[in-house]
């Protein structure tokens, strides 16, 4: 027989009159639902707080690693300068440079600003364009080796049995020993989407700065590719932020015999622009460092007869 909750009072004849009765199980179920809703609210709030704390913790750890890397680099430089006094200055200088370069690249892999080349779109490229892309990857790595503040470079969705991988190995001496991260995984599964900025010339937003806690994605397409908006479309489908280099904000079209103007850059050229901006915090210097004169653009301050943007 089901238990019941009796609520009542005394009747005129001294007896007990039941005013209301309800199954105890129903009341307990109602209370249980209320508690569950409260717990769910608490869990959501706690989850949001935890994510913020974890993000701050990761950023703090990355900054700490950068400081440690710089201190280690300085110690290594001093140590090498004290060693091998009988070695010629030229030999010692070469050894020091090589050791410091390695130390910087390892420090970047531990805590550097992350930049990824998205190599998932090679089906749109011809054999010739894939060879050009491999050459651009080589130049990109060469620039990173020379940088005062190298990036932590990722090559994503690069399969070992692909034509691009074979071109990279054949064209780039020591490619398999590059101090970068090469993976068959997609960048979308490696990084939090809210921290990603996909750089594409088709984006409406101009890149204002280079932030240490963001991940910058470059589409692995060469500047000869005729397909339009491939990387932009992919980024929008995945729901990540897109941005373009601020060419329109700092440069103008320059008259030339072919009337040729292009904002499509090789990945190593975009990389050089980001490296220079990170060192100088000056977009005019950065754009001048990476955009070849043949693209038909000059700095606004240097243009004598700029053409209007069409």
Swiss-Prot record:
GO terms for cellular component: nucleoplasm; nucleus. One of its GO terms (molecular function) is tRNA (guanosine(9)-N1)-methyltransferase activity. It holds the Pfam family tRNA_m1G_MT. Its EC number is 2.1.1.221. The keyword Manganese does not apply. Keywords: Coiled coil, Methyltransferase, S-adenosyl-L-methionine, Transferase. It is an enzyme of class 2 (transferase). Residues 55-94 form a coiled coil. The keyword Metal-binding does not apply. Residues 101-298 form the SAM-dependent MTase TRM10-type domain. GO terms for biological process: tRNA N1-guanine methylation. It catalyses: guanosine(9) in tRNA + S-adenosyl-L-methionine = N(1)-methylguanosine(9) in tRNA + S-adenosyl-L-homocysteine + H(+). S-adenosyl-L-methionine-dependent guanine N(1)-methyltransferase that catalyzes the formation of N(1)-methylguanine at position 9 (m1G9) in tRNAs. Probably not able to catalyze formation of N(1)-methyladenine at position 9 (m1A9) in tRNAs. Belongs to the class IV-like SAM-binding methyltransferase superfamily. TRM10 family. This is tRNA methyltransferase 10 homolog B. It comes from Danio rerio (Zebrafish). The gene is trmt10b.
């Amino acid at each position: 027989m089901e238990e019941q909750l009796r609520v009542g009072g005394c009747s005129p004849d001294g007896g007990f009159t039941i005013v209301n009765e309800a199954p105890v199980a129903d009341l307990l179920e109602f209370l249980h639902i209320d508690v569950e809703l409260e717990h769910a609210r608490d869990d959501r709030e706690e989850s949001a707080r935890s994510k913020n704390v974890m993000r701050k913790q990761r950023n703090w750890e990355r900054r700490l690693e950068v400081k440690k890397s710089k201190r280690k680099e300085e110690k290594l430089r001093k140590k090498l300068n004290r060693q091998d006094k009988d070695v010629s200055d030229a030999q010692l200088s070469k050894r020091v440079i090589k050791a410091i370069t390695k130390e910087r690249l390892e420090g970047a892999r531990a805590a550097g600003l992350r930049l990824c080349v998205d190599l998932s779109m090679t089906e749109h490229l011809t054999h010739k364009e894939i060879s050009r892309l491999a050459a651009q990857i080589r130049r990109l790595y060469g620039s990173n080796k020379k940088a005062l503040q190298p990036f932590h470079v990722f090559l994503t969705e690069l399969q070992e049995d692909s034509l691009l991988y074979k071109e990279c190995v054949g064209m780039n001496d020591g490619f398999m020993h590059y101090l970068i991260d090469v993976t068959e995984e997609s960048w979308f599964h490696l990084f939090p989407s809210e921290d990603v900025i996909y750089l594409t010339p088709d984006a409406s937003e101009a890149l204002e700065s280079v932030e240490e806690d963001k991940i910058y994605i470059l589409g692995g397409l060469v500047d000869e590719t005729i397909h339009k908006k491939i990387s932009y479309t992919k980024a929008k489908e995945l729901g990540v932020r897109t941005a373009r280099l601020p060419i329109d904000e700092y440069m103008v079209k320059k008259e030339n015999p072919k009337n040729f103007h292009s904002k499509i850059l090789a990945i190593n050229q975009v990389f050089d622009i980001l490296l220079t901006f990170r060192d100088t915090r000056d977009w005019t210097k950065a754009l001048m460092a990476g955009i070849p004169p043949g693209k038909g653009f000059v700095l606004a301050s240097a243009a004598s007869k700029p053409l209007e943007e069409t």
